[in-house]
Regions:
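Fold-level recognition of mixed alpha/beta catalytic cores in primary-metabolism enzymes, strongest
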Residues: 109-118, 122-218, 228
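A structural signal for short hydrophobic beta-strand segments in well-ordered beta-sheet cores
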Residues: 41, 59, 92-94, 238-241, ...
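A structural signal for isolated positions on well-ordered beta-strands in alpha/beta enzyme cores
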Residues: 42, 69, 131-133, 292
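Residue-level recognition of beta-strand->loop/alpha-helix junctions
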Residues: 45, 134, 295-297
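Active-site metal-coordination/substrate-binding segment of hydrolases
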Residues: 67-131, 155-156
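Catalytic metal-binding/acid-base residues of hydrolase active sites
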Residues: 19, 75, 139, 169-170, ...
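Metal-dependent amide/peptide-bond hydrolase catalytic core
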Residues: 1, 36, 169-173, 180, ...
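N-terminal helical capping/dimerization or prosegment-like subdomains
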Residues: 1-80, 254-258, 272-275
Length: 345
């Protein structure tokens, strides 16, 4: 059985230009490496209406329980202007003891480290199984990735007892933090509709712009909560305001705005929708405007209550890095929001 070098394997993975949702051969390469270690691998390709097909991989070594799973992704975000890079982002290089290239941080190097660790560990006798859930749809719209793999595993009655999500977590020092939950995320797309008219004849129009500004001011200043034991306070941010006006002397017929809320376990997406819709309804009724609202829920908040597995991981990190990681729920969403439906993570 081969033993893999983590740096060499990371470089090999990073050479694939797997800009989400393009696979570029990454999953087949990774499956070959895992099969050489004795893993049984299943490449799962999913597609949805108006989206490109996405390759995913579920690999398992052993049949016994507990089944310890590592979750990650091999898709990366676009590299942007190549002239801004000191190296070709898909020709990784080590400079001043740093691995540079797309995926070095998020998160091909993490995948490589776990696979390399397993290649060294598997010669030992251990109880249970080791599995990997790797997607090619984490950086994009995330509808044909981990979410679909979880649905597949549920249908197959595949049991995962604990899942370690290998996303980058530490901002300053390696080992300083591990995530035991995430805030929920909901995005709102609001349109306030009035009556278009000429600015010289405002009595013949109904300007939705002041109504929208009042609404946005109100929701931006809402104190949703003061935070909870495991979560920071929920927060709403306005991210976009727009009208379709192309002239300076026209009162717009409608105004659109987009906002996002990162919320803790004091709320659900449904409770927030109800609260917000009441605000929109009252404001528009008073102004004789109307409104349209749609929402996209990226995930609900969740928490994995610290247990013997989280403590074992915490102690192992401290042993290696000399830092005891803080247990946190900060930051953005991750695919843990899907995996939590079948396993603590």
């Amino acid at each position: 059985m081969p033993i893999f070098n983590e740096l060499k394997l990371a470089k090999e993975l990073m050479r694939f230009p797997s800009i989400t949702p393009v696979d570029a051969g990454t999953m087949n390469f990774l499956a070959r490496k895992l099969r050489s270690l004795g893993f049984k691998c299943k490449i799962l390709e999913f597609k949805s209406k108006n989206s490109k097909p996405v390759k995913n991989l579920y690999a398992r070594l052993g049949k016994a329980r507990p089944n310890f799973c590592y979750a990650g992704h091999t898709d990366v975000v676009p590299p942007g202007k190549l002239s801004d890079w000191t190296v070709n982002p898909f020709k990784p290089a080590v400079k001043k003891n740093h691995l540079i290239g797309r995926g070095a941080n998020d998160m091909k190097a993490s995948v490589a480290c776990f696979v390399a660790a397993v290649s060294k560990f598997k010669s030992k006798k251990f109880k249970g199984s080791i599995s990997l859930l790797i997607t090619g749809d984490e950086e994009g719209i995330a509808i044909n990735g981990t979410k679909r793999v979880v649905e597949y595993l549920k249908r197959k009655k595949e049991k995962i007892d604990f899942c370690l999500v290998g996303e980058p977590t530490n901002q300053n020092k390696l080992g300083e933090m591990m995530k035991i939950g995430r805030r929920g995320s909901i995005t709102g797309y609001l349109t306030v509709c009035g009556v278009q008219g000429h600015v010289a004849y405002p009595h013949d129009a109904n300007n939705p712009a002041p109504v929208m500004t009042k609404i946005l001011n109100q929701i931006e200043n809402i104190k949703l909560d003061k935070g909870t034991k495991n979560f920071q306070p929920s927060n709403l941010e306005i991210v976009k305001i727009n009208t379709d006006n192309t002239a300076d002397n026209v009162i717009p017929g409608e105004v659109t705005a987009t906002f996002n809320i990162r919320f803790n376990d004091r709320h659900s997406s449904n409770s927030l929708k109800k609260k917000l819709n009441n605000i929109f309804r009252k404001a528009c009724r008073k102004s004789k405007c109307s409104f349209k609202i749609s929402y996209m829920v990226s995930g609900e908040s969740f928490i994995t209550v610290p247990n013997k597995t989280t403590r074992m991981i915490q102690n192992t990190i401290k042993k290696i890095t000399k830092i005891k990681p803080k247990l946190s729920t900060s930051g953005g969403t991750s695919d843990a929001r899907f995996i939590r439906k079948i396993s603590p993570c």
